[in-house]
Regions:
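Short, surface-exposed acidic
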Residues: 33-41, 61-70, 158
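Metal-dependent phosphoesterase signature
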Residues: 55-94, 100
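An amphipathic alpha-helix signature
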Residues: 21, 25, 48-53, 65, ...
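Helix-loop "lid/cap" segments that line or gate small-molecule binding pockets
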Residues: 27-28, 47-61, 118, 151
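Active-site neighborhood of HAD-like aspartate-dependent phosphohydrolases
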Residues: 1-42
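Short beta->alpha linker loops
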Residues: 19, 46-47, 71, 85-89, ...
Length: 219
């Protein structure tokens, strides 16, 4: 029986992936380097150090990474100050989860300060039973460590957890951890080899009917 819903954050709860992409591409252009959308897709759901390693390899180390990082982060913060919206269906889904008495966890590759900033305008963060950020793990997605840590800290088994993700890296982490997984794609579609093991939906509102297929209905 389903006991917990484990949420990714960027691109799933918040519409942040597009401004991450703009920031990474802006910082590349500042050094005369073009980061295409196809190149950026490799970074979705992956922690920054690994993304930067891929980027350095892609440009054969012809990039000043210290300068790049500073420009990228400054541009991201500038864009983020304009406001970040919740993704379609999150409000209703979160309410439905709480009505069913299910446990919730936030499991993100982002750092804790970014989590606090994103949730500041909304009354949701303190409603999560567990929060796992980049600071808590040694290995980023697609490694399963974050989701293994989540269900263990919650005192549950992997099969009692449903992971919601927008990225292939996150889905791979969830499946490797032994959890059920639903993908709500944001900037890229699910990889073909994953399709038989997951459910793919258009938005978070569509997750609500699945809750009753895994566990007790709301009363």
């Amino acid at each position: 029986m389903l006991k917990a819903i484990l949420f990714d954050m960027d691109g799933l709860i918040f519409d942040t992936e597009s401004i991450y992409r703009q920031s990474w591409q802006f910082a590349g252009a500042e050094q005369g380097l073009q980061i295409t959308d196809d190149t950026y897709q490799q970074f979705i759901g992956v922690q920054d150090p690994e993304c930067e390693r891929i980027l350095a390899e892609h440009f054969q180390n012809a990039i000043d990474m210290t300068r790049y990082r500073a420009v990228r982060d400054a541009h991201f913060h500038q864009l983020r100050e304009q406001g970040i919206g919740l993704k379609t269906g999150f409000d209703g889904l979160f309410s439905a989860i709480k009505l069913r008495g299910l446990t919730t966890a936030l499991v993100t590759s982002s750092h804790r300060p970014d989590v606090l900033y994103n949730f500041a305008p909304f009354n949701y963060l303190d409603q999560f039973d567990l929060i796992i950020t980049a600071e808590d793990v040694q290995h980023g997605k697609p490694h399963p460590e974050c989701y293994q840590m989540a269900y263990r800290k919650l005192g549950l088994k992997s099969q009692q957890c449903l992971v919601l993700e927008d990225s292939n890296s996150g889905i791979k982490a969830a499946l490797a951890a032994g959890c059920h997984a639903v993908m709500i794609p944001d900037l890229l579609p699910p990889q073909t080899e994953l399709m038989s093991d997951i459910t793919v939906l258009d938005n978070l509102a569509q997750v609500i009917p699945l809750l009753d297929s895994y566990g007790p209905k709301a009363t």
